[in-house]
Every structure is written in C-alpha cells, then in structure tokens.
Amino acid sequence: MAAGGNRDGEKRGSRSQADSGFLGLRPTSVDPALRRRRRGPRNKKRGWRRLAEEPLGLEVDQFLEDVRLQERTTGGLLAEAPNEKLFFVDTGFKRKEPRKKRTLVQKKSQRLQKPLRVDLALENHSKIPAPKDILAHQVPNAKKLRRKEELWEKLAKQGELPRDVRKAQARLLSPPTPKAKPGPQDIIERPFYDLWNPDNPLDTPLIGQDAFFLEQTKKKGVRRPQRLHIKPSQVPAVEVIPAGASYNPTFEDHQALLREAHEVELQREKEAEKLERQLALPTSEQAATQESVFREMCEGLLEESDGEDEHEAGRAGQPEAGDGTTEISPTGAAGPEKRMEKKTEQQRRREKAARKLRVQQAALRAARLQHQELFRLRGIKAQVARRLAELARRREQRRIRRLAEADKPRRLGRLKYQAPDIDVQLSSELSGSLRTLKPEGHILRDRFKSFQKRNMIEPRERAKFKRKYKVKLVEKRAYREIQL
C-alpha cells in the first residue's frame, strides 16, 4: 500500500511539475494546475455558481486576468518570451558625452515636436492589436465607382473632362465679383423707430380706417400706459458696495462697515428677545390660579350690582316720605289717558303769529350777524391765511416724506422686504490678494434682492408643499345593505 501510494504521489508530482510553466507578474499569481480541483455537479446553475465562488474558480479568474495583463504590457506570456527580451548583458558604466548647449530656437522647436500629455494619454498602450473591422474598410458601390473611374480615365484620354472639373475651371477663368460687406456706418444709418412713439411708420397704412374694426381685428397696437414710463424706484440697478467691503480696505472704512453690521445684529437680537419675552411661559408665581381666574371673570359685575341696589333702595324710600295721596301729572304714563280737544280759532291765530314772529326774529338775527361779519373781515383773512399755511406745511411734509420713502421698498404683497445680510469679513479673514480672498455673497441672490428692493417683484418665500392624503373610498351602510 505504501509503495502504491508513493507511486501515485510521484505521478501526481510529475504532472504538477509539467503543468507549472506559468510566470505571473503579480506576487499573488498562482498556477491553477498546482491545486487539486474539487469535483461537484456541473449540470446545474448551483454548481456553476459554487465553482466560481470556490478558491479554484477565483484563482482561474485571477490567472486569466494575469494572462491578459501580460499580453497587453509585453505582447505575450513571459514564460514564452526569449532570454534576449528578458535579460541584457551589463558591460559596465557608459561614459556620457557632454551635451551641447542648445539655443532658444532649438529648445522651442524640440518642445513643439514633443507630443502633448493629453495626446499621450489617449494613445493605445496595449500590445494587442485592435480587431480589424472588415465593414469599416468596405466601400458601398465599390464596383460601380471603380467602373465609373475607369470610364472617366478613358474619357480623359480622349480630352473630355467631368462636369464638376469643367465648372471649377470656369470659375477660375471668370471669378465672381465679391459682394460689398456692410460696414458699421451702414448699420448705424439703418432706419429705426420707437415702438411706442405715436408717429410710428407702421401705423401709417391704418390712418383713416375704422377704430373699432382695427381694435377687433387686433391690427391696432396696444397703447403703452404712462405709468410704465416711470421707474418704480429711484434706487440704482447696481449699487456700489461700501469701501469697507474691499479686499484691501483702509482701517477706518473696515471698522465703519463692521460697526454697521454689528448694529444690524444687535437690532435682530432685540427683536428675537422681545418675541421670546412675549411668548415666554409664566413662572409659578405668575401662573393663574382658580381664584384669580374667577376674579377676572367677575370684574365689573359686582360694582354694577351695588349701584343698582342703592338706586332701588332710594326709589323704595320715596313713597314712605310722603304719606298723603300722590298726585300724578296729566302727562305721566301711569295717569289716565287724556282726550285730545279740538283747538279754537283764537289758539290757531296765536300759534300762527308766534311762528311768524320766530321767523322774523331769526331773519333779524342772521342779518345782524352778517353785518357784524364785516367788522371781522381782518380776523377772517388771518384765519384763512393760517389755514392755507397749515395746508402748505402738510403738503410740504408729504412731499418730503415721499422723497424720503422713494428709495425704500414698498409693500407689494403679504410679506415685507427683508434687507440681505451685509457681506463683511473680519480682520483675520482679510487677504491682500484676490487669489486667496474668501468669497462672500452670491450674484444671483444679489440680483434677486435688487429686484425686490426696486419694487419690480414682490418679496417671496419658499413654497410649502401641502401633504396630500390618499383618497379613501367608503361604501355607505345603507347602500351596502341593498342586495340585488
């Protein structure tokens, strides 16, 4: 048994030595023939997957990848390469010849002959030639074109040239006259007109036609409103930043800008503290109790009830003071209803005379007052002058207020305009070079805020997405109980 086992081992060892002729470039490259492969079912996908995941399958993949790498880099396997390709004979140190100094022109020409790095990166460094595409070298209608070339060669010998060659020769003999290119003066002198001008030349054919017809057929231009000729704000489109925002500002300008930014932050903190103070929860000492809530609810009710009690007590004591019979006035509501008696002629004459006398007295009083107004003419003039001066003062105040608010953004929507933060850098962040300067702000955000400040668009906020619930279909019970 032992001898047989040794014989089998010698056969296996000799087979391994015969198969191991592979030289790998990587230190992990191992000849797969040195390992004994495990047997397993290969007629199912499970066996294929297991074979690929086993160490032997991984080594086979690594072996094939190493073979491809050698073919790409050296043009073949290292085991098959001759000794002259792998080794060289060292004959000793070679003495370098002194290099001649090159002129600037020679250096420049050599630099121009040297290929660029981008071209070297795009070159094919693989030793394996690319597969030849036969279709790329095929020419459609090659036989037809070859016959046509033979025909034209035969005609050229007879002195007849193709049509395109004859046209080219004719163009050379009689070249076309070059067209004059329009210069800058021609472009400036080109007629132009104002689109909103009332003397528009395009409206000349429409003069004398029916205005209603032109309006209905959309041939009449839209009249530009006068308000569109006025700018909504006098703020310049591009504002010059303060001197302290420069990349190399003076000490005074930078400190002034820092002070301005500091005041803005202080104002913002005050508003935040005020809001927090208003929304703060009360302490245990300030918390409302049941007694304080009841006292607040009864506030004002107890005083009114006390006054009513005193008033009722006074009314109740009045009949006790006079024990006699109380006389009720004839006009009182508690007395018997009085019958309306017919007026006599004498009473009617007296009432008519009294009315006439009152009218005469009112007319005399108005005439007397009008006569007295003549003596108050100087006072009236002074009063009118004071009123006119007051109106002029108010008018001037409104004009000054409008001028002061001309540069301020108006409220165009439900949101107020919020000024952007001041772009400022601390003293430690300043740099004397534009290359190392830390960027501040954003050009798109700056333009958007400029539109809002100049009253061209309203202040906006980010749209809030509303949650949409899934539609749920419910069948009513009365409908569900109906069975057909």
Swiss-Prot record:
Region (Mediates interaction with CDKN2A/isoform tumor suppressor ARF): which ranges?
A: 148-437
UniProt biased composition (Basic residues): 35-49
> Which residues lie within the region annotated Disordered?
1-51, 304-356
Q: Which UniProt keywords apply?
A: Acetylation, Nucleus, Phosphoprotein, Ribosome biogenesis
UniProt GO molecular function: 5S rRNA binding; identical protein binding; p53 binding
Annotated Gene Ontology cellular components are: cytosol; fibrillar center; nucleolus; nucleoplasm; rDNA heterochromatin
The disruption phenotype is: Knockout embryos are not able to form viable blastocysts. Transgenic mice lacking the expression of Nop53 in the thymus display a dramatic reduction of the number of thymic cells and of the size of the thymus.
Please give the positions of the paired cysteines in each disulfide bond: none
* Keyword Nucleus in record: yes
Which Pfam families does this one have?
A: Nop53
Family statement: Belongs to the NOP53 family.
Describe its function: Nucleolar protein which is involved in the integration of the 5S RNP into the ribosomal large subunit during ribosome biogenesis. In ribosome biogenesis, may also play a role in rRNA transcription. Also functions as a nucleolar sensor that regulates the activation of p53/TP53 in response to ribosome biogenesis perturbation, DNA damage and other stress conditions. DNA damage or perturbation of ribosome biogenesis disrupt the interaction between NOP53 and RPL11 allowing RPL11 transport to the nucleoplasm where it can inhibit MDM2 and allow p53/TP53 activation.
Q: Can you state the subunit structure given in the record?
A: Homooligomer. Interacts with PTEN; regulates PTEN phosphorylation and increases its stability. Interacts with RPL11; retains RPL11 into the nucleolus. Interacts with CDKN2A/isoform tumor suppressor ARF; the interaction is direct and promotes ARF nucleoplasmic relocalization and ubiquitin-mediated proteasomal degradation. Interacts with NPM1; the interaction is direct and competitive with MYC. Interacts with NF2 (via FERM domain); the interaction is direct.
Q: What is this protein called?
A: Ribosome biogenesis protein NOP53
What species was this sequence derived from? Mus musculus
> Gene for this protein?
Nop53
